[in-house]
């Protein structure tokens, strides 16, 4: 980290996709943009739902002076709790088209990369504060094989190659109630203010001591 560079947390969410007009990950991230948490500014970036485009946005941000942590957010429709993702695997495999209409099968995130990268976020500490606050959450062992997993894997891979040992990882969020209602789904959901609160209380745990 450059001496004197303002310390900040990179917080990302995704654009809406799959016909939706809203994505809770992007909404949560936008609401926390600019907040000071643990003496660090939150810098929010909303990512396109296409793996190459999302990587192109994130890659230069990982080089930024003063970066102390990276927290990616995404949507996991059908899950009832905040999902603290433990691992990202080296594969993209999805039949749901991305924003460019692309589908992939058995494509590595990084050719010849390791099979998986583990989150370096303090997952157990995060789970403890969420549970104490009455927010449903758990440590998840699968982030899927869509864009969320890819951006988590490629971020952890890039940081490792650069020798930047900062906390980084991925958190999945449930549907918003409006999304369940709009599609007449029998699926769990979570209010936006509660999701904002969840991320707001875990971010301080990512800030390393000076």
Predicted regions located by residue number:
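Short conserved micro-motifs at the rims of enzyme active sites and ligand-binding pockets
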Residues: 181-183
């Amino acid at each position: 980290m450059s001496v004197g560079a303002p310390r900040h947390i990179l917080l990302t969410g995704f654009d809406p996709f799959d016909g939706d007009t809203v994505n809770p990950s992007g909404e949560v991230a936008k609401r926390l943009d600019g907040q000071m948490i643990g003496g660090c500014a939150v810098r929010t970036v909303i990512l396109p739902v296409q793996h190459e485009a999302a990587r192109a946005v994130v890659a230069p941000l990982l080089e930024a002076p003063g970066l102390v942590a990276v927290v990616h957010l995404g949507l996991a429709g059908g899950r009832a709790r905040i999902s603290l993702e433990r691992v990202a695997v080296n594969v993209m495999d999805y039949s749901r088209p991305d924003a460019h209409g692309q589908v992939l099968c058995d494509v590595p995130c990084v050719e010849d990369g390791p099979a998986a990268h583990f989150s370096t976020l303090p997952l157990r500490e995060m789970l403890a504060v969420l549970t104490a606050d009455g927010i449903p959450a758990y440590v998840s062992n699968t982030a899927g094989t869509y864009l969320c997993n890819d951006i988590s894997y490629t971020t952890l891979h890039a940081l490792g190659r650069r020798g930047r040992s900062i906390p980084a990882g991925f958190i999945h969020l449930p549907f918003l109630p409006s999304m369940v209602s709009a599609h007449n789904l029998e699926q769990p959901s979570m209010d936006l203010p509660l999701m904002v609160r969840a991320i707001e209380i875990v971010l301080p745990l990512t800030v390393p001591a000076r």
